[in-house]
């Protein structure tokens, strides 16, 4: 039976929409000629997305939650927050803009609509002119960037019933970006009541009165052993008992005494007693468990001119909330007397000596945490932050534009440096740079490239300068599937930290927009059916704004074991047919209780799910990234001996049971590495931070002790390591050892196996799995010890790993890379790894022992490699420049030039070519340039369109789409770009293949003034003719004129549809905030031939738009046969071919010294 939870949320969403429908026109502002509420747009001007607002604000992406139905079109803000998540729209939007799906304003449609930034947008059919119905609208909101205080609240009650006291009032910080507001959130004021009598209850007491109290956790669990005190009586006056209760005689019932409680491992709590009768008062004190601080906002890098001001901001959370901060400059602690100890660091009148790295540390009772470093760049007078001369950026030209007989030809189109510029007037006392500017394109120049039979237009960067930055939004998409069966996890709840942000789809898909200033993206997926363990993941993302795709594998819960609460039981950890159990979980009798502390007696269903590191495949289902906060507040890695999740419930109940104390026994034979038996500890995962916390560390009981078999009265003669833990909430436990021998491994991804620097690919997720030491070393019988992931940027990725300097093969690793659903291939190592191919200099390559997965067996996949993690040795020049870097040289690893040693991956899909007249780096959305010929007209929303072409023929064929302006006056007939794709064979039909060809979507161009239906011409590059066109697609094109000329039977031409048609038409459209993710998802649907599926296996007969019949050209007779049949003709052909070869050779020699604007292939 399906869980009712998803149905409940769908009902809530329906109520949101119903609430919008019930709204009347008189409730809110009504507009018949405006699509923007809060600031009316000028229809003759560009969209407000490109205007400079006086307020520090930005537009959200577009939303469309409703389609025109019986009553009209309703885009309520409540429904948008439900479907897209509350983080997608700020609490108080400044403005709202609405447009139809054809990008028309309501005024242009002549429709009466209602818009309010606080409620949303709606259009009612009954209010429209006769014969008209509401169009399908989508909306976006304008949200403030800068944090600001709200209005003060009302004054509270006086703290004293007599005499002198004080009262408080509070205000809240309103910020959509998570920034903090300067100043205090509360204000105090003195208040005077009537004079107190001479003898007060505080001094005289009430002998016949009694105070009854209890000490509990926020969930209601009683706490025993808490020390209780009164503010007027120093020292401990009582201690809470077994059920968390205590009694204090002599406290007057009406005194409203302030009672405090303290307990090891918990923050202090205070509460006020209230009279329960004439002589009895009661109080409940809530103690929160101490939580180490963690950063929710890190200081950000800034650029300033000498003499300007700058503000760095740091914000930490924890239990209790950290209030003490320390600031460091280049590792040196700044004077607190001058800079203070708050979360803001303000520097005024900057000079060159203040440039460098800044970081903060936050403290509370549980520990400390260190932020990442922010770089402050101070420009000298006259120094430019943005070089007006563009950097080199090579793009590959089509094959028929290259030199005869040469390799691929590249053209330098220029690229502006990815740097920040100082604001026009510096920075005030606020966290964010509201008017931040970046180095961007100021001017483009048009060039013409002569190719074989045609001229190729291109626009190159001519000048760079400082302009307003485009908003950068990290985006993570992916899919959650079962680790054992691959079935999607449908409607799983998604938590960002502890806050719910949405659900997975029916196919298990999800999309998460990374909040600003996020360092670690911690996401939890909760299965509504309860069949899977909660999956807590730290998802790598690209802070530059490129989208990243992840596949999450959820671990199915183990079968239930029935126990008796009064007898307890033992459950093995990791027992399989191939390997004995690593240990066991011992649940003592009489220790089970309800979450509120009530003892539980009766049967218990226990599910203990173990992630066994002896199984290499289990790494993909492991939670978190195995990190913890060390004593210095820095992230440090752990090495696992296994993870386990415990689920204890009464049969048929949904309430989870707790255990006051459980023991974990680990077989000592599995812990062989020196020092690990002493360092092994029990850890639990905090789902809010994704960090592991040592169990019992505050009492010093988190480690293991050694017990012999005799002491444990066991039959087998074995030694065990015994540790203890308390089971509460829904936590994952871990058997780990901290590891200090750490390094970074440099990895780059390329578009092809030529490994050209200009073809580096960003957004690739590189995963490194630390394996056990080689045979001959003191190793544990396990397959992996930890894992780590990183996302490639413009300069590759640096992945953390364990390493050893003395023994090269003491640590080994297995490395893979993936982009979306595609696995990349590693550089080959057969028959012998060479430096030129692998990318690592000798003799370091020999010491690393690089081997691709198919090194010993060519039949295996090529998607990974193994290596020895040999730490570079001092004094060895070949090891000083990668690919392995010591832990303290992370900056050297990140900034290493492409000529330094690194490991390489390349995309398998090499039979694909893309050309844009206005160059755009899809992995760096900030490189977008506003131009009418831009392939992507909107930098905040990328729409990818694909056409599925079926080809009947004996081989695979290249298919080209030529995309030019169709209906727009300024671009009609002008080229947008080219796309070449090789068809993929149907796995079961050798005579059929299909190609998913990208074309430029129809819609608004950069100026947002007029729609253009792109003229798309699809041509297979072979002897092919068009034999069929999808009937629905032909019907649609006929009903939406004008029609494109279709005279050429060897091609298919159309004016791109404005609607997202779907698989029934053979057209696949996906809109996303990342161009790469939009294309990856659209290609997966195109391969599958469905509008909601995803496949990497081509289904050539499903969901096609047009079909071509191709045939092989007649084979040319051999030279011997031609000489026999027609000697004179054959000799003439040979002379002509030799003459052409001679001319090509002379041309190459002439152009060898001067290549003009063309760069050589690399």
Curated annotation (Swiss-Prot):
<dbReference type="InterPro" id="IPR039675">
    <property type="entry name" value="CILP1/CILP2"/>
</dbReference>
<dbReference type="Pfam" id="PF13330">
    <property type="entry name" value="Mucin2_WxxW"/>
</dbReference>
<dbReference type="Pfam" id="PF23599">
    <property type="entry name" value="CILP_C"/>
</dbReference>
<dbReference type="InterPro" id="IPR003599">
    <property type="entry name" value="Ig_sub"/>
</dbReference>
<dbReference type="InterPro" id="IPR003598">
    <property type="entry name" value="Ig_sub2"/>
</dbReference>
<dbReference type="GO" id="GO:0005576">
    <property type="term" value="C:extracellular region"/>
</dbReference>
<protein>
    <recommendedName>
        <fullName>Cartilage intermediate layer protein 2</fullName>
    </recommendedName>
</protein>
<keyword id="KW-0165">Cleavage on pair of basic residues</keyword>
<feature type="region of interest" description="Disordered">
    <location>
        <begin position="23"/>
        <end position="51"/>
    </location>
</feature>
<feature type="disulfide bond">
    <location>
        <begin position="158"/>
        <end position="191"/>
    </location>
</feature>
<dbReference type="InterPro" id="IPR056258">
    <property type="entry name" value="CILP-1/2_C"/>
</dbReference>
<keyword id="KW-0272">Extracellular matrix</keyword>
<feature type="glycosylation site" description="N-linked (GlcNAc...) asparagine">
    <location>
        <position position="330"/>
    </location>
</feature>
<dbReference type="Pfam" id="PF23730">
    <property type="entry name" value="CILP_8th"/>
</dbReference>
<keyword id="KW-0325">Glycoprotein</keyword>
<feature type="domain" description="Ig-like C2-type">
    <location>
        <begin position="293"/>
        <end position="377"/>
    </location>
</feature>
<feature type="disulfide bond">
    <location>
        <begin position="173"/>
        <end position="181"/>
    </location>
</feature>
<dbReference type="InterPro" id="IPR000884">
    <property type="entry name" value="TSP1_rpt"/>
</dbReference>
<dbReference type="InterPro" id="IPR025155">
    <property type="entry name" value="WxxW_domain"/>
</dbReference>
<feature type="disulfide bond">
    <location>
        <begin position="162"/>
        <end position="196"/>
    </location>
</feature>
<dbReference type="InterPro" id="IPR036383">
    <property type="entry name" value="TSP1_rpt_sf"/>
</dbReference>
<dbReference type="InterPro" id="IPR056257">
    <property type="entry name" value="CILP-1/2_8th"/>
</dbReference>
<feature type="signal peptide">
    <location>
        <begin position="1"/>
        <end position="20"/>
    </location>
</feature>
<dbReference type="Pfam" id="PF00090">
    <property type="entry name" value="TSP_1"/>
</dbReference>
<dbReference type="Pfam" id="PF13927">
    <property type="entry name" value="Ig_3"/>
</dbReference>
<dbReference type="InterPro" id="IPR036179">
    <property type="entry name" value="Ig-like_dom_sf"/>
</dbReference>
<dbReference type="InterPro" id="IPR013783">
    <property type="entry name" value="Ig-like_fold"/>
</dbReference>
<feature type="disulfide bond">
    <location>
        <begin position="314"/>
        <end position="360"/>
    </location>
</feature>
<keyword id="KW-1015">Disulfide bond</keyword>
<dbReference type="GO" id="GO:0030246">
    <property type="term" value="F:carbohydrate binding"/>
</dbReference>
<dbReference type="InterPro" id="IPR056256">
    <property type="entry name" value="CILP-1/2_b-sand_dom2"/>
</dbReference>
<dbReference type="Pfam" id="PF23708">
    <property type="entry name" value="CILP_5th"/>
</dbReference>
<dbReference type="InterPro" id="IPR013784">
    <property type="entry name" value="Carb-bd-like_fold"/>
</dbReference>
<keyword id="KW-0964">Secreted</keyword>
<dbReference type="InterPro" id="IPR056255">
    <property type="entry name" value="CILP-1/2_dom"/>
</dbReference>
<dbReference type="Pfam" id="PF13620">
    <property type="entry name" value="CarboxypepD_reg"/>
</dbReference>
<feature type="domain" description="TSP type-1">
    <location>
        <begin position="146"/>
        <end position="197"/>
    </location>
</feature>
<comment type="function">
    <text>May play a role in cartilage scaffolding.</text>
</comment>
<keyword id="KW-0393">Immunoglobulin domain</keyword>
<dbReference type="InterPro" id="IPR007110">
    <property type="entry name" value="Ig-like_dom"/>
</dbReference>
<keyword id="KW-0732">Signal</keyword>
<dbReference type="Pfam" id="PF23591">
    <property type="entry name" value="CILP"/>
</dbReference>
